[in-house]
Structure formats: C-alpha cells, structure tokens
C-alpha cells in the first residue's frame, strides 16, 4: 500500500480515470463526500486528512453544478499535516487571474480551451521543490525526469500564453471564499437566472452562493415533476443555435445518471435531467432574452410530449 489519496465525489471524469489507474497501482483512493449543494463536508476534515493520506486533489470550481470549494482552507490544513494538495482550476481561470503566491496549493492544473485558447494544451503549476519531490519518489510514478510524455507543442503553448495575457480581471481568494469580479459575464448570468427562476420546469442546483459566476445549472422536468432527460433538451436547444451540456462536457454522451447528481443526493428520478449553461463574455441582453424564451418554449414542447405518452 503506497498511501491514501483523497478526492471529492464531484471531480471531473478525467481525474476519476486517473484515480482508478492509481488504485490499480497500489494507492488507496478515498472520496470526500459533499452536501446537497456540492460542497465538501468540512466535518470530515480530520478523518480525510488523517494518516495515511499523502495527497488531496479537489476541483476548485465544479464544471457541472458550478459549486466552489474552500480550497485555501483545505490547503492550509494539508500544509499543517505535510500533505500534498492539488486543485483543478480549469473552471476558475476563465473568470480571472489569481495570485499564485497567496494560494495554499502545492499543485494547480488548468486548460486553455476554457478561456478561448487552443484545445489540447493545459498547464501544471508546482510549488517550489514539489517537482524534485515527485521526481525523486518512485511511488508517484514519474519516469525519466518528465512530468509528461511526448514533445511539447510550441504553437499550443503560445496560444495558451496569449489567452492568459488577454485576461484582465482578478479573482480574490480568502480562506473560505473565492470572490469573482463583477463584469458583463456575471451580470448576464444573473439576468438569465432571474428570468429562468420563474420557470416551474427548472430546479436550480449547486450552491447559489459559492459558485462560478458564468455557470447556471438545473434539473429539467414538467410542472408535475415528470423528468425530462438532459440529453433531450440539449439536442432540442442545439437545433436552435444554443449549445448547452448535460453533465460534464466530455461525458455528456454517456448513458445513465450523472455521478455528480448522485453525489449531491438529487432525486433519483432526476439524475439524468441535469442541464448546464455557461455564459461567455460576448453575450448581450438580447441574447439572454432569446435564450430564455427558447428554453421556455423547448421545455414546454418536451413536457407536452411527456403528457401524451
């Protein structure tokens, strides 16, 4: 047994895939439960960070339901116990730059395509001394002195660098909160939420306080709570030029209930009914009105079909 790795029950599918590989390599993988809003249960902190935990990996901003984890608080507790801490900041970086020196994080990863950069390129930030620690410890699995295999793509790296250079706003991180700038994205997201919250065919999910400023997530159903599958509404909206997702984008074609919706204990009948909308900086008031109307009409159309069955 090489030790224990802690991840949350709402991680991105890509991290769960790696966790399963590490499990086969002899690591013990333990999942940190979340509450109904998708936030980790801090009452379990001492249990999760007890021996033999060696690494904790927590998604900072959850892509499917938008909830934000208190990463600085967790990082501080990991530091006290000499536990390595990694966070997935893929959903955070598009919303603004942050001060790496003030984060209680040893390792941070992100991806370019979320901030209008090229697909196929990511970054891994390491606290000073961490790379040597990983390379010199065979149990972590790095070989030949390399963090990743293959030849780096210079055009993709340059594209990612340019995308970061174009970020002009800042995210403030306290021990318990991640504070985002108020801008057009947050205003348009709030405007769309204000319009959609009136719709009796939608139930909002995820933390409504600690959440990504560009993310809206809900369960779809008829007014009498008959489930409408997320895949159905995604297909209908895409035909009208509105591109949304059910579940995480990379697994939206998967059959069966969403692991994230299962983790937050949503109604079993609605665990395939998730819908996620992400707002970009180019969205206008007119776009919001159009999207709201089309979503309303599409849900009504699907509800009528359900009633005929």
Protein language model annotation of sequence segments:
Residues 1-309:
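Pyridoxal 5′-phosphate
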